[in-house]
Structure formats: structure tokens, C-alpha cells
């Protein structure tokens, strides 16, 4: 059952006071200092210059920002009319370490925010404030939490500061973003019960973080006028621009294995119903369990502007599809999406993701990897991407070119490393007014200045 929380109408002054008390930034030292915005672009490619601060977004353009925090995944979308959508809030608490697949000493050798105790959501907060100076919109109109993994919504432990608004949650990830900004709506895969495929607040290995997130959302729903909804597959009316001035559509493709069929708003449930779930240990789902792993429950969407299309699928993967065909959630989502211009790599480019079949159907001109450990993306996945899509351009927020953990992954070849178009920074896709073409920029991250390091394009939307 889908539920939408409704609110009584409050007097204007009361609403103003309520929101003011709900979106005050926590008292922390800014990570990104205010910088000059530069000249407004007129849509000409030549106005984006390497070595200068990224030009401000202009009305009619659509921006897709892959914000690098070294702690997970975060995408911020500015629609042509200034409507703002935040997808995830990269804030794991993984320490700098050299333990197998979580090794991150390579990428953090360049920049390690954890040395100063800086949380991912603090970096995101300051980044969003710069973007909001362009748009004049101080509201995050929509937040989508794609799924309940810490590198997407925010880890939690006893060392984190408690929110000044409620003692029921601590500040990191989406809970901190909720405290720092006025927010219109939060969409996720579990509201309001968070009980599929089992009780997510008491059984998974990250139950403490999930409970912290749920407490924050419930507080802001009850006290701050935030709406919370289950992400609904198949529809185009859940995430909508504030105006109808531009042809922008956000199609919700899938959530919890409920996948759009391509026919109207019709969907098909591909995962077992809750009553049919069989899992030995919810804290460690195995390939033989009749239970979907958290990654394949991700919220999946396609954002379209004119001829431009962007596919983002959280941590979609196809692990263990030989045991249960429905555990390949990636391919059916690709089939119903069809061809796109830009794709966020599924599951950071990890193993058992971005299959040749899915890549062939999506056929992106550009793939962006939001990476946060040394083995993102896997060398085999990079090679597969280019073998499947020889002319595709690849961009990676953190790209480790040195030796990778023995027995986990191989070092990226010099030839493949040279093919990566942009890396080690924020990746920004800027779509021109009308959606006919776009450019991709890599901007500085560690200094917070958003200085342009690389510009690719323009690419022509198909």
C-alpha cells in the first residue's frame, strides 16, 4: 500500500517559524568556502574554461552533479526551471583502510576528508549552497534515498553529534541534510513501515543506521512540513518540475523489484512477496536465499529533457541470477528504459553489474562512476564497458590507477587509464536549453572551489 502523509494548513507565520526551526545548518566549519560565481553562461561551449570556477547554472539548462565526498554516492539535479532533486547523500563512515575490497588508501591519498573529521553530508551541504546561489531556490524539492545502504543515506554511530532538533537521531547523511535545508518531499523504498523484505529497522547488519534515518524522516514529517512517500514505480507524477515551462519528465522505473512494464503506469512485481521470503540470516543475505539483496531493491529512474535522457539505478546488479532469475534486476530495468545519453554506472561499477546486455540496450554516450573505494570501478567492468560501447566516454569521481588489493582486483592498464575522460573530482553534466546537447565537466573537489579541470563535449542528444 502506498501512503502519502497529509498536513493541516497552518497560518503563514506559523509555517514560516516552523520551517525556520527545521532547516538551520548545524554549527560546523564550512567545508566549501564561498567563491565568485563568474559570468553567467549564454549556452556557448567556449565560456566554460579549464582553470576557472564553473560558470553558474542558467535557467533553461539542466545540471546533473555527481558530488564527490569519498564516502559514497550523491547526485544533485537542477532542472531547467530550478526545481532541485537530491539523489542519495554519500556519507558512509568507512575509515581509511587497506582491507580487501574496502581498501581506500589509494583514492584517499589524494584527498581524505576524514582526517579533519569532515562528514560527507557536510561537504554536500556546502556544495548545495553554492548551487542554490545560482538557482535562488533554497529548497531541496525532492530527496530520493535509492536504498538502505550507508554509502547512500548515511551511516550512524555514537560518535556523531545528536541533532539539535531531536534526540532521536544523529547527524550524518540524509538526516543532516534534512536538518540543514528546507525539504519538500523524501521518497524512498520503505516508507512508512520499512518492512520489506523484512523489518529493516531491527534485522539487517546496518539496522542502527536505518533506524537513525527513519527517526530523522519521521521527525521532519511530524514537525517540519516534509512529505514522505514510498517511491512509486511506473509513474511520472511523483517527481515533477515546479513549472511546466520546460519539457522534463522523471519516470520512476523500479523499486523493490516492482518494475514498470512500459505500458502506461503498469508495473510487474518480479520479487517474492513478503510472505514468501525465505532467508536464514537477514544480516547476511546469500545467493541461495529466496530474498532480494538490498542493492536490487534500489529506486530506479530516468530523467528526460527534450532528446536528452539520464538513467540512474542506485546499486542495481545481477548477482546470483543463476539461482533466481529475478535477482538480475539490472536487465529488465534497462529494457524498459531504452537508450539514454548519460548513465550513472550501476553499483559504482562493482562486479556483477553493468552487463553487456544492459549496456547494449541503454547505449549511453557517457557513463559516470560515483566511486569511493580503490576497486571502483573494477578493471573488468571498465574493459567490458568499452568492449560493449567502443565510443563511450567514461568519467570517475575517484580513480585509483595504482596497485589494487591482491586477490580482489587487478591494476588498471595504462591504455584503459588513458581512456578515462575525467576523474578525481566532481563530475557535472550540463544540458543545454531544450536538451539538444550537453557537456561534461570535471571540477575540483578537495579545495571546494569547483574549478574546472576538464571539459568534454558538446555531445549531441539523440
PLM feature segments, named:
Residues 1-11:
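Bacterial N-terminal signal peptides that target proteins for export
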Residues 18-21:
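C-terminal motif of bacterial Sec signal peptides marking the signal peptidase cleavage site
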Residues 23-30:
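Bacterial lipoprotein signal-peptidase II cleavage site
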Residues 31-63, 69-71, 127-130, 136-142, ...:
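Flexible, acidic/histidine-containing loops and adjacent segments that form or flank the divalent-metal
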Residues 63-85:
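N-terminal active-site segment of His-dependent metallophosphoesterases
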Residues 70, 90-92, 149-151, 191-193, ...:
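Catalytic metal-binding/acid-base residues of hydrolase active sites
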Residues 340-410:
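Internal alpha/beta domain cores that form substrate/cofactor-binding pockets in large enzymes
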Amino acid at each position: 500500500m502506498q501512503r502519502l502523509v497529509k498536513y493541516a494548513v497552518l497560518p503563514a507565520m506559523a509555517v514560516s517559524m516552523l520551517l525556520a526551526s527545521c532547516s538551520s545548518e548545524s554549527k560546523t566549519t564550512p567545508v566549501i568556502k564561498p567563491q565568485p560565481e563568474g559570468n553567467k553562461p549564454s549556452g556557448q561551449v567556449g565560456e566554460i574554461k579549464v582553470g576557472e570556477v564553473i560558470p553558474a547554472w542558467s535557467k533553461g539548462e539542466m545540471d546533473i552533479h555527481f558530488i564527490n565526498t569519498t564516502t559514497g554516492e550523491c547526485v544533485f539535479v537542477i532542472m531547467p526551471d530550478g526545481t532541485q532533486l537530491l539523489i542519495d547523500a554519500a556519507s558512509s563512515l568507512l575509515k581509511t583502510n587497506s582491507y580487501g575490497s574496502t581498501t581506500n588508501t589509494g583514492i584517499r591519498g589524494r584527498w581524505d576528508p576524514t582526517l579533519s573529521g569532515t562528514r560527507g553530508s557536510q561537504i554536500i551541504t556546502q556544495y548545495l549552497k553554492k548551487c542554490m546561489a545560482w538557482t535562488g531556490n533554497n529548497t531541496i524539492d525532492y530527496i530520493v534515498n535509492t536504498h538502505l545502504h550507508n554509502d547512500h543515506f548515511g551511516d550512524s554511530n555514537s560518535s556523531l553529534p545528536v541533532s539539535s532538533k531531536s534526540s532521536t537521531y544523529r547527524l550524518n547523511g540524509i538526516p543532516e541534510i534534512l536538518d540543514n535545508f528546507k525539504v519538500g518531499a523524501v521518497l524512498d523504498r520503505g516508507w512508512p513501515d520499512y518492512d520489506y523484505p523484512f523489518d529493516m529497522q531491527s534485522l539487517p547488519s546496518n539496522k542502527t543506521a536505518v533506524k537513525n534515518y527513519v527517526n530523522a524522516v519521521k521527525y521532519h514529517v511530524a514537525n517540519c512540513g516534509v512529505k514522505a512517500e514510498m517511491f512509486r514505480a511506473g509513474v511520472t507524477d511523483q517527481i515533477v518540475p515546479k513549472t511546466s515551462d520546460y519539457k522534463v519528465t522523471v519516470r520512476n522505473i523500479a523499486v523493490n523489484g516492482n518494475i514498470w512494464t512500459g505500458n502506461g503506469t503498469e508495473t510487474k512485481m518480479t520479487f517474492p512477496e513478503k510472505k514468501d521470503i525465505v532467508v536464514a540470516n537477514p544480516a547476511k543475505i546469500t545467493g541461495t536465499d529466496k530474498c532480494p539483496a538490498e542493492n536490487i531493491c534500489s529506486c530506479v529512474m530516468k530523467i528526460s529533457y527534450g532528446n536528452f535522457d539520464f538513467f540512474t539505478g542506485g546499486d542495481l546488479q545481477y548477482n546470483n541470477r543463476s539461482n533466481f532469475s529475478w535477482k538480475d534486476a539490472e536487465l529488465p530495468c534497462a529494457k524498459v528504459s531504452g537508450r539514454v545519453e548519460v548513465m550513472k554506472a550501476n553499483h559504482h561499477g562493482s562486479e556483477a553489474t553493468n552487463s553487456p546486455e544492459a549496456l547494449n540496450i541503454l547505449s549511453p554516450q557517457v557513463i559516470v562512476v560515483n566511486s569511493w573505494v580503490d576497486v571502483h570501478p573494477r578493471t573488468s567492468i571498465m574493459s567490458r564497458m568499452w568492449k560493449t560501447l567502443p565510443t563511450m566516454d567514461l568519467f570517475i569521481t575517484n580513480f585509483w590507477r595504482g596497485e589494487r588489493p591482491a586477490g580482489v582486483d587487478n591494476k588498471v592498464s595504462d591504455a584503459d587509464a588513458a581512456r578515462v575522460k575525467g576523474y578525481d573530482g566532481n563530475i557535472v553534466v550540463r544540458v543545454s536549453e531544450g536538451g539538444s546537447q550537453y557537456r561534461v565537466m570535471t571540477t575540483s573537489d578537495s579545495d571546494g572551489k569547483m574549478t574546472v579541470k576538464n571539459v568534454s563535449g558538446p555531445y549531441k542528444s539523440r
